[in-house]
Design a protein with these regions (language model features):
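Hydrophobic positions on the alpha1 helix immediately C-terminal to the Walker A/P-loop
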Residues: 71
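A noncatalytic interaction/capping subdomain that flanks phosphate/NTP-handling catalytic cores
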Residues: 1-64, 74-84, 89-198
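Conserved lysine of the Walker
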Residues: 68
Length: 198
C-alpha cells in the first residue's frame, strides 16, 4: 500500500488479488486506508469495546489484555446490554455532540454495528485487585484518549489533529477510570457510577 504523505490518497497493490488467502490482508489494508480517510473527515478511531446502555454507546478502553471484552461481556450477561463493537469505535462530533459511528472492523469478536449512536461516555480500564471508579482531571482525560486512539499520527499535523480532537471530545462526554477485577462486581460498580452521572 502506498499513501501520500499528506494522506490525500492511498493505493493498494495486490498480486493475485483473487486468492482467498489474501482476503484478510486486503481487509486490514483497507481498514488502514479507512483510518486515513476518516481522520480527514474529523472522525477518529478509539481502540475499545462498546456497549449500548440507556440509549447511548459506552466505551471500555485500555491496553491489550486489560479486559475490555471481559468487562463488556460482564455487562451483557448481567444487564443484557448489547455489545456494539468488539474492538474499534469511530468517534466524531456533530452539532456539538459526540457520536459513535459504526464500522465493520471488530477484531476477533466478530461483533460490530454500522449504526450511529450518541456517545454516553468512555471508561478506561486498569486491572486491580479491587473495583473502584475514579474521575480523571481534564488534562489526563485528553491524554488517556490519545493513548488509545489508532488514527494515523505519522506527521506532526496528523498528531495535532488527534490531540485537538481528544481535547475537544473530553469535556463533551463522561470519562471514567475503572480499577477493576474480572468479576461481575466490576460491572456493578461501573454501572452504579454511570447511573449516578446521568
Amino acid at each position: 500500500m502506498r499513501v501520500k504523505k499528506d494522506s490525500s490518497a492511498a493505493v493498494l497493490y495486490c498480486v493475485d488479488a483473487d486468492n482467498k488467502d489474501h482476503a484478510e490482508n486486503i481487509f486490514h489494508a483497507l481498514r488502514f486506508a479507512f483510518l486515513i480517510a476518516a481522520q480527514k473527515q474529523a472522525l477518529f478511531v478509539l481502540h475499545s469495546v462498546s456497549i449500548f446502555y440507556q440509549g447511548k454507546a459506552w466505551l471500555f478502553s485500555g491496553s491489550s489484555g486489560t479486559g475490555k471484552s471481559t468487562h463488556a461481556n460482564l455487562w451483557a450477561n448481567r444487564y443484557h446490554t448489547p455489545v456494539l463493537n468488539g474492538d474499534l469505535n469511530v468517534l466524531g462530533i456533530k452539532n456539538g455532540l459526540p457520536y459513535l459511528y459504526g464500522l465493520p472492523w471488530c477484531g476477533t469478536s466478530e461483533t460490530y454495528t454500522t449504526t450511529t449512536y450518541p456517545l454516553g461516555g468512555i471508561v478506561f480500564l486498569k486491572q486491580a485487585p479491587f473495583n473502584r471508579v475514579n474521575s480523571l482531571p481534564p488534562d489526563e482525560q485528553a491524554l488517556f484518549l490519545m493513548q488509545r486512539m489508532i488514527s494515523p499520527t505519522w506527521t506532526k499535523d496528523l498528531l495535532l489533529k488527534n490531540l485537538a480532537f481528544a481535547e475537544t471530545l473530553a469535556p463533551l462526554t463522561k470519562i471514567f477510570r475503572l480499577n477493576c477485577t474480572k468479576n461481575p462486581e466490576a460491572a456493578a460498580v461501573m454501572k452504579a457510577a454511570i447511573d449516578q452521572s446521568i
